[in-house]
Amino acid sequence: MKIATLAVVSAFAATAIAGPIRPDGVGNDKFLIELGPGETQWVTKQQKHEMRAYINSIYKAGQGFVDITDEFGTDFTTAEVVPANYPKSALHAAVVNPMIAGLSKENLMRDLNTLVKFNNRYYESPTGVESATWVFNEVQKIIQASGVKGAKVEKFTNKFKQFNVIATIPGASKNTVIVGAHQDSINQKDPMKGRAPGADDNGSGTVVVLEAFRNVLKSKAIQAANATNTLEFHWYAGEEGGLLGSNNIFKKYKADGRKVKAMLNQDLTGFTKKGNPEQFGLITDNTNAELNEFCKTIVAKYAALKIVEAKCGYACSDHASAHRNGFPSSFIAETNFRNTNPYLHTADDVIANLDFNHMLEHAKVVVGFMGELAMTPNL
């Protein structure tokens, strides 16, 4: 995707300022974005939105950038990948199958109907904060109802208004397994005030992770504190602004020396194009090859759909934040990016376009991923 990122840079070269050197007069109105390893530009907020729109017009979905403004002047280097040992087969069906049995399409519908009622979930809008608050409160209710000892939820704040939500289920070890989804949405023409229901992008991933969390907490093994590894469920802020929330989290985890052994991203889980085979898209660029193989094992064991490998370009979603900070990550999307939802980032990204049966298959994969790795020793 090197050529693609260079094409984007060229398209904006007349107005954007080459990085990484801070140009004279640059203040809070300029942002440093990374379009690929070593490819940076200073842009205004308007240019950042225009660049995202330009990228979308060419690639439809995928190919993005990371806003690395806060890294300017630091010695950021891509960390060495945290080593992990993934099972070659699914070994904990007795734990996972009850989780799958509890998954509810009705819960997915109910939760998504709530999310799309916010005018938008843009990371700097009032309703973007309100939607994050709704997710936080919902997670809190789920934890309280479960009675699982040590389970907790916290707000991970950012310099912008919207916060990340992190739920933790402690295990016997500090080795951590994460599933995440961004909950913000954007109307590309009017980010702050425009209608952006974001049903697919990424209300669908948000509620899939929420429903998975609900059923992992119902597991007898989890309730008995038998998990070997710590589990985290993330709902990210500001993905549409350049992976802002997730990059903040994984930068801190890297600085803190956290042992994140696996991260699974759920972004776009509900759209299937008519006339095309229903399938998962397993993203192979900017992800971990060994973890991807484990994901194939999970899909084969617990889901009814098959996988097709695909690429989505640099920084296309939040798994890239984990990847650039040295943590193994995978991304399973609703399909390959050639057949993705044509309504993304518009007022027409609505529930009527989605398939809740497809979303349920994603939820099966998530609980399979989390359940299996929760119980894996020596990860």
Curated annotation (Swiss-Prot):
Alphabetically ordered keywords of this record: Aminopeptidase, Disulfide bond, Glycoprotein, Hydrolase, Metal-binding, Protease, Secreted, Signal, Virulence, Zinc
**Self-association state and partner proteins as the record states:** Monomer.
The protein's required cofactor(s) are namely: Zn(2+)
Principal location listed in the UniProt entry: secreted
Q: Which residues are glycosylated?
A: 202, 226
Positions annotated to bind Zn(2+) 1: 182, 201, 267
Q: Per the annotation, how and in what number is the cofactor bound?
A: Binds 2 Zn(2+) ions per subunit.
GO CC field: extracellular region
| Family to which this protein belongs | Belongs to the peptidase M28 family. M28E subfamily.
* Disulphide linkage map: 312-316
Query: Metal-binding as a keyword?
Result: yes
What name does this protein carry?
A: Probable leucine aminopeptidase TRV_05286
Source organism's superkingdom? Eukaryota
What's the EC number here? 3.4.11.-
The signal sequence is 1-18
Which GO molecular function, any one, fits this protein according to its record? metalloexopeptidase activity
- Return any one Pfam family short name: Peptidase_M28
SUPFAM superfamilies, per database record = Zn-dependent exopeptidases
InterPro entries documented for this protein: M28_fam, Peptidase_M28
Work out whether the entry's keyword set contains Transport.
no
Cellular localisation: Secreted
Instruction: Write down the species.
Output: Trichophyton verrucosum (strain HKI 0517)
Which Gene Ontology BP annotations are present? proteolysis
Q: What does this protein do?
A: Probable extracellular aminopeptidase which contributes to pathogenicity.
